From Swiss-Prot:
Lineage: Bacteria, Bacillati, Bacillota, Bacilli, Bacillales
Source superkingdom: Bacteria
Family recorded in the similarity comment: Belongs to the UPF0738 family.
InterPro entries: UPF0738
Name under which the protein is recorded: UPF0738 protein BcerKBAB4_1107
């Protein structure tokens, strides 16, 4: 089973940032927010974790969307993933990214390319 949802673009609407993803075979209506974000250094992405009863699904937010994430964070805008015409709020995304940015800043363990990309957008 596929365990990753790839964000392809972002849209803004009043008081919300929407990450748009390709349709998937994953049963999206069964997913809920996990309030946790990981880093994918190889693909320069943040991975927001969704879950259902049996597995975790990762929403891959690529560096090409980080400017929009940063702007939404500064405005305290809610952020959602839209896939298969279903929207799920990515609860806690702002706080998780803030925490990650603090840890990534100047930390070579994440890889120079990721550190540079994060510092360029978020600092």
């Amino acid at each position: 089973m596929q365990n990753k949802i790839q964000v392809k673009s972002v849209e803004t609407r009043e008081n919300a940032l929407i990450f748009c993803a390709e349709n998937t075979e994953i049963e999206v209506k069964e997913l809920s927010a996990r309030n946790h974000v990981l880093v994918d250094s190889d693909n320069l992405s943040f991975l927001y974790i969704l879950e259902n009863e049996s597995s975790f699904i990762y929403v891959s937010i690529p560096h090409t969307c980080w400017e929009a994430v940063h702007e939404a964070m500064n405005k305290d805008t809610a952020m959602f993933i839209r896939v298969n015409d279903v929207e799920i709020e990515l609860e806690g995304l702002k706080e998780e990214v803030e925490y990650l940015v603090e840890n990534i800043e100047g930390n070579a363990n994440y890889g120079e390319e990721l550190v540079t990309a994060v510092e360029k957008v978020f600092l």
